[in-house]
Amino acid sequence: MAVDTMESVAVVAVPFPAQGHLNQLLHLSLLLASRGLSVHYAAPPPHVRQARARVHGWDPRALGSIRFHDLDVPPYDSPAPDLAAPSPFPNHLMPMFEAFAAAARAPLAALLQRLSTSYRRVAVVFDRLNPFAATEAARLANADAFGLQCVAISYNVGWLDPGHRLLSDYGLQFLPPDACMSREFVDLVFRMEEEEQGAPVAGLVMNTCRALEGEFLDVVAAQPPFQGQRFFAVGPLNPLLLDADAPTTPPGQARHECLEWLDRQPPESVLYVSFGTTSCLHADQVAELAAALKGSKQRFVWVLRDADRADIYAESGESRHAMFLSEFTRETEGTGLVITGWAPQLEILAHGATAAFMSHCGWNSTIESLSHGKPVLAWPMHSDQPWDSELLCKYFKAGLLVRPWEKHAEIVPAQAIQKVIEEAMLSDSGMAVRQRAKELGEAVRASVADGGNSRKDLDDFIGYITR
């Protein structure tokens, strides 16, 4: 493709301001920039900083290929997560979500207007939770809007037709949004969708691949809301790392201590435990999980941290688990490692010593784990995570259920957790699940290689926006 054709097109990425959304669009932005496109990434200032600081799997110098823009929004409260809240949904983020929904449109419109005068074409790739971006793109004669699907495409099948044959054939249960999200968040999403209804969208970009969700892709493409749209299944967006036994950190940067620790462990001997950036465990549950890890006698890396605040740079103070950790780390020295800060998840999952992943089942974590051939011990917390847990355990057959969603308000006892850990790490049935995850990982890797379906869809997307 001619260089002048690429340079005459601007891509504007507009993420929703939460970690699991920020990083997907930044991964896509880096992919597109690596192909020679001019890419602009627009978010509130703390979230631009957050996305840049937390991206991993790329050479840090790659960030220089992206132009970052601040979408200024009014001040908002950034409280700590409410550990006493009746719902596990991170409702403490709602002040920020509301401020963003109300105020991000104007600075985005100004940015798009400015870019539209400098480029032949502007392609706006927006998180589907930001439908106002499509409306603003439609005001410009030389702009197209493309929604980014940040959750599994199969989630749309459950949303549109919970009784669909694919769900019943595999025994998949779809929970309505208000069962696993707060009423305030559901109301915000529906309100934004209603306000922007009718905004033209040229297509849908998806962080998935046919190797994982091919059947569901075909079903969704035939549904009335999506008929006539172009579908680009370009996932996984996360980089696919090689076995990280050898250091991959660029010269001059320190390698995370957990990777050095993993280097000293036998192959496929370590359980990685992390529940993402929007979930907290109650102190009683932390104690039960700790007892299970200790009792299983399995090696582990455990990321023990609370959910992000709206502004992660407003966080301060030591971990609330500090007293517990001083004793637990002493008791498990040599067997496990606890991380209370940010962890390099992709590198951990790619490491040859890592055997499995105990996870909240966010779509990022799900696809990152499968793309590196690692099974998931499923512990869904909120939002689309119960659905991802269903997919992992029943459809992909690459997961083991730790806690069913209907028991999300209960403390899971150590004995039950330990049983699943031992099944995953020691049993024949666990070995079968691990083998299935490896097979899926190989299929996912093939999809992004030359000639793979995801590579073709990425090429088609670039070809369309630079036409």
UniProtKB/Swiss-Prot annotation:
Stated pH dependence: Optimum pH is 7.5.
Catalytic activity: cis-zeatin + UDP-alpha-D-glucose = O-beta-D-glucosyl-cis-zeatin + UDP + H(+)
Active site residues of this protein: 21 (proton acceptor), 127 (charge relay)
Gene3D superfamilies named among the record's database cross-references: Glycogen Phosphorylase B
Organism ancestry: Eukaryota, Viridiplantae, Streptophyta, Embryophyta, Tracheophyta
Keyword annotations of the record: Glycosyltransferase, Transferase
Homology family: Belongs to the UDP-glycosyltransferase family.
Record-linked InterPro entries: UDP_glucos_trans (IPR002213), UDP_glycos_trans_CS (IPR035595)
Gene designation: CISZOG1
GO molecular function terms noted in the UniProt entry: cis-zeatin O-beta-D-glucosyltransferase activity; UDP-glucosyltransferase activity
Function per UniProt: Utilizes UDP-glucose as the sugar donor and catalyzes the formation of O-beta-D-glucosyl-cis-zeatin from cis-zeatin. May regulate active versus storage forms of cytokinins and could have an impact on seed growth.
Record flagged with keyword Amino-acid biosynthesis: no
Binding site for an anthocyanidin: 21, 91
Native source species: Zea mays
Protein known as: Cis-zeatin O-glucosyltransferase 1
Binding site for UDP-alpha-D-glucose: 343, 345, 360, 363-365, 368, 384-385
